């Protein structure tokens, strides 16, 4: 892939779905190929995924959340995935939307 010649300190990416076993899934095979290559060439992987990704399904596996440096999400995942993140030393950052901040 074209991006195989690139190296990055940080990769900020999202995914189509996160399975209960931590598998990160994507819908498009071409996008999956680019993300997998960049993950392999990045020192830190910052993953952004809202709560809908925990129940979504997609066809192409791009890796496992255990590879991530941090997961930024609006809601914490279920206990099995939380345990995997903890044991893999992935920092989980729960963020709120701007609407919630304005309402409070």
Across the structure, where does each feature detected by a protein language model lie?
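Conserved phosphate- and dinucleotide-binding cores of soluble alpha/beta proteins
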Residues: 1-104
